[in-house]
Structure formats: structure tokens, C-alpha cells
Amino acid sequence: METTLTNQLVDIVFGLSDTAIEVPALGLRIPILELLHAILINYTYRTALKQSHAEIGWAQGLLATVVMSAGGGSTSALLLGNPLGILKSNRFWGIYGATYWLMFSNPYFYQFLQYLFAIPMMEQLFTAADGILRTSAVVNGGVLAVANNKDLGDDKWVAKIICGALSGCGGGLWTDAFRLSSAQWSFSTPRLLRTASVDMKASFMTALFYTAATTPALCEWFDLPILGPKEAQAWSAVVLSGGLIYRTYVTRWQQKKLELPEEEKKDQ
């Protein structure tokens, strides 16, 4: 039963990761998960700006969304002395740049997304895509990047967990530190360092789980079955996506709590 479930999970996670829109005329292949992630990042950024979206410059907004999208993996790469992944991918700039342009060049695309995200479970669908992509960053840009680093190696468990966790939530850390989701940027101590966010906790648990599940010695300590790389990544995607989806509900509950006093004041 466990083997069957794991195999099905591997097929789903990696099947979604491989799904893409083919554009033969242009010779393009656009991965669905990357497109959904780009839309989610830009929509979240545009929503956070509220009315101040008209005050930001094009370069400022693009840089903010790039940090939000790839800040985690880039932070891990810098720590390990590796080239930034976004510099090795023309596709990244095409997908995220085009999505950013659509979001801020006219009001209609954002209004359409507002309608789309109002549909039940739609936000969770985009968030699940975000979770699968982040898991790939945790695994490839964090844990495996440490294992393949000649100066570190496969036995550096702490480095794996740190770089893996940063790959999953580093973008949010930089966004919070420099207030990138506002029109005026300023540096201050990241609030996430005082109170860990759901993203940080989920990313940390994902890095810890993957490292433990693929390391025989750690499996013995945590009493876990040893998993292959694909199996461990698939279950890690469940852990991270589950945490991020939970965050969407928490955020919604908090918003409703804030709206209730305002409605009561209006009634009075």
C-alpha cells in the first residue's frame, strides 16, 4: 500500500513538473508550474501594493518580483559559491518578465485574476504549484547543491538543511527585510527572524525531511524508511505544499477577523 501510494505520488509530482505548453512556431516550451508560479507571485505583489502600485517604477517592480520568485535559490547559490540559477535560464526571464508586464501594463489582467482567485480552491491550486516548485529548489538548489559541493560534501547535514530551508523561503526573507512589497523600500530586521512564518517552518521541515529520508544514518535516528531521491522529493512536495496551503487558510481567517470589527462599526 505504501509503495503504491508513493509511486502514484511520484507520478503526480513529476508528471506535473514535466507538463508544459508547447509553442512549435516559436520553439518554446513553457512549463505549467512555472507559469502558475509567475502568476501567483505577480498577483500577490500587486495585491500587497494596493493603491501604491502606480508609484513604483518598472525596474523596481521587476526586481521585487524576481527576488520574490528566486531569492531563496539565489541566496543558497551565493552561500555555496555557485552561479545563480536565474542567470542560466532565459526561460525564467521570459515567463516572469512577461507575466509582470501583463500584470502592471493594464488593469484588466489583475481584475481577471481577482475573479479567478475568488473561485473556491483556485488559490490553493496555485499554491500547490508553488509548493512543488519550491520543493525542487529546496532539493536541487539546497540539499543536493551542498552534497555536490566539493568543499562541503554529502555528510554536511546542517549545511543541507540550512541551504535547503533558505532555498524554500529566502525570497520571503529578503522581501520582509527590505519591505519589497511596498512602494518605498527600507531595510530593517526581518520580522521573520523574530517570529518564524509558516513558509519558513514548512521550508525547514521539508529540507529536514528530505535530508533525513535520503540519509541512512539519519533514517535510523528518526525511525524513517530510506527513500530514493524521487520518492523523497515527492513526499517533500506534499510537506511543503501542505504547509503553504495551510497558510492560505490562516491568512484568510485573519482577514475575516479584521473585517468583522469594521463591519460592526458600520452597523453602529
Show where each model-derived region lies.
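Transmembrane helix-loop junctions and nearby membrane-interface residues
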Residues: 45-48, 138-145, 248
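C-terminal transmembrane helix-loop-helix hairpin of multi-pass membrane proteins
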Residues: 23, 153-268
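Mid-membrane cores of alpha-helical transmembrane segments in multi-pass membrane proteins
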Residues: 11, 33-40, 61-71, 89-107, ...
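The feature identifies polytopic integral membrane transport proteins across all domains of life
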Residues: 57-63, 120-124, 191-196
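Transmembrane alpha-helix boundary signature
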Residues: 74-82, 105-115
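Helix-coil boundary and interhelical linker segments in multi-pass alpha-helical membrane proteins
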Residues: 1, 82-87, 143-158, 218-224
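N-terminal topogenic module of multi-pass integral membrane proteins
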Residues: 1-93
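Membrane-proximal helix-loop-helix units in multi-pass membrane proteins
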Residues: 109-189
